[in-house]
């Protein structure tokens, strides 16, 4: 859909999904998340070298795993000028009522196991705040059984204070479609409109 709208698109595979199976430990990575972030950053390097891509006009969009990886990558790389996350996050403390087991697999962030839940040194409110003043849109469905929309709102409320310091609170927006763990057309259209405005 983005390509049909004229956007140059790159959709990197996540480590150990589909056919992409790098040995991230042998490559020096502790987690699949950091390998994915590095792959995404290298993808930005490729896009940056393409004459078809406008300088400063790169966005990140993703659903579920792609949704939090859009946030992670944009936190590490300011070349991403706008970010969209669908069903991609809530706070670690709210996730599955505090059971972060799935976040601690080697595919994600195994070092989270080293911390008590309340002592994890970062959470999504920190990462979303770090995106400011860049535009950020999150679709957090009312019936998502993975990420709680109420927690998404709490994350956004905390991050919005940083957006306010920049005087751009309106650049952080959240929507709650009445669906399950999905990225419905109405939300995708809203995401594409954000990209059309900012990229």
Q: Each PLM stretch: what is its role?
A:
Residues 82-128, 133, 142-156, 164-168:
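Mobile cap/lid helix-loop segments that gate and shape the active-site cleft of serine hydrolases
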Residues 1-49, 94-99:
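Cap/lid segment of the alpha/beta-hydrolase catalytic domain
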């Amino acid at each position: 859909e983005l390509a049909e709208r004229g956007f140059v698109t790159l959709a990197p595979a996540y480590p150990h999904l589909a056919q992409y199976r790098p040995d991230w430990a042998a490559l020096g990575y502790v987690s699949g998340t950091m390998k994915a972030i590095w792959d995404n950053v290298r993808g930005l390097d490729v896009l940056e070298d393409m004459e078809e891509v406008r300088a400063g006009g790169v966005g990140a969009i993703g659903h579920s795993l792609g949704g939090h990886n859009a946030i992670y990558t944009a936190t590490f790389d300011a070349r991403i000028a706008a970010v969209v996350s669908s069903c991609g996050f809530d706070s670690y403390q709210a996730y599955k009522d505090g059971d972060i087991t799935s976040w601690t697999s080697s595919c994600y962030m195994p070092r989270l196991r080293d911390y008590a839940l309340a002592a994890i040194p970062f959470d999504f409110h920190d990462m979303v705040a770090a995106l400011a003043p860049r535009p950020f849109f999150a679709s957090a469905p009312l019936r998502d059984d993975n990420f709680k929309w109420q927690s998404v709102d709490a994350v956004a409320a905390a991050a919005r204070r940083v957006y306010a310091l920049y005087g751009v609170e309106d650049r952080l927006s959240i929507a709650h479609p009445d669906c399950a763990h999905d990225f419905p057309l109405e939300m995708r259209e809203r995401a594409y409109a954000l990209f059309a405005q900012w990229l």
